[in-house]
Regions:
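Ligand-binding beta-strand-loop-alpha-helix segment within the catalytic cores
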Residues: 1, 57-137
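N-terminal glycine-/serine-/threonine-rich phosphate-binding loop
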Residues: 1-33, 100, 119, 124
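Glycine-rich N-terminal segment of FAD-binding domains in flavoprotein oxidoreductases
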Residues: 27-54
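Short glycine-rich anion-binding loops that position phosphate/pyrophosphate groups of nucleotides
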Residues: 39-40, 70, 142-144
Length: 144
């Protein structure tokens, strides 16, 4: 049975998650992280960035895959999940941007009418995750 840990607030939950991820990266330098956007994981990302810096954790081989992306929104748009992940995770942690992906990598602003391209995006993304060895740990949010 999984262990259930009750914490007092979102910040403490973020710190606990960050510790688990930091320990994972120390033991598996090429860890594959499943990344989420939104407000729920921000404390975790903030604590993880602090741990990476304070403990001099090498993140040069860490890979990441975001949960989702908007269809029809260019990756460079400030509200895209690509931009959000880079702003909240890649830059603060010092991850290699070439090793962090969103489903939209293969779409990059494709219009909704581009059904064939969109239809191939999911299987291509799944194949990229599989080629990376699967997700080692996934962060999710439940909304606030």
């Amino acid at each position: 049975m999984p262990e259930v840990i009750i914490v007092k607030d979102q910040d403490e939950a973020g710190e606990l998650y960050a510790r688990c991820v930091a320990d994972l990266i120390k033991g598996k330098p090429d860890a594959v992280l499943g990344l989420a956007t939104g407000s729920s994981p921000l404390a975790a990302y903030r604590h993880l960035a602090a741990m990476v810096k304070a403990e001099d954790i090498d993140v040069s081989k860490v890979r990441g895959f975001a949960l989702d992306e908007y269809i029809g929104l260019p990756l460079t748009h400030p509200e895209s999940y690509h931009s959000t992940i880079h702003r909240t995770v890649v830059e603060p942690l010092g991850l290699d941007p070439e090793k962090v992906h969103v489903p939209g990598d293969v779409l990059d602003g494709a219009p909704l009418e581009d059904g064939e391209r969109i239809a191939h995006a999911g299987p291509e993304y799944d194949a990229a995750i599989e080629a990376a060895g699967g997700i080692d740990v996934q962060i999710l949010g439940i909304g606030t």
